[in-house]
Amino acid sequence: MSKGHSLQDPYLNTLRKEKVGVSIYLVNGIKLQGTIESFDQFVILLKNTVSQMVYKHAISTVVPVRPIRLPSATDADGADAEPGNA
């Protein structure tokens, strides 16, 4: 996994697995809402009443409807999470 995806992939995967609703803001200001059905290196499949394939290069911001907790190596040991991952 490349260094650029070390946060992006676990973040998107947690949103997908927990079916957390998201607002995705595009670089042109358009707001899309739904749940992340799938994603790869280049696109996110966003599900609402229909599925939309959204190219990552067009995305400005991904905002979940609730806080999420990212899995980390320290969580597996039972230790406290790193600052900022609460």
Swiss-Prot record:
- Which GO CC terms are listed, alphabetically? cytosol
Disulfide partners: none
Record InterPro entries: Hfq, LSM_dom_sf, Sm
From which residue to which does any coiled coil extend? none
Q: Which residues form the Sm domain?
A: 9-68
Q: What GO biological process term is on the record, naming one? A: regulation of translation, ncRNA-mediated
Keywords on record: RNA-binding, Stress response
SUPFAM superfamilies (UniProt xref): Sm-like ribonucleoproteins
Report a single Gene Ontology molecular function: RNA binding
Q: How does it assemble?
A: Homohexamer.
Instruction: Give the function comment from the record.
Output: RNA chaperone that binds small regulatory RNA (sRNAs) and mRNAs to facilitate mRNA translational regulation in response to envelope stress, environmental stress and changes in metabolite concentrations. Also binds with high specificity to tRNAs.
* Family the entry assigns: Belongs to the Hfq family.
- Protein name (database record): RNA-binding protein Hfq
Q: Which organism is it from?
A: Pseudomonas syringae pv. tomato (strain ATCC BAA-871 / DC3000)
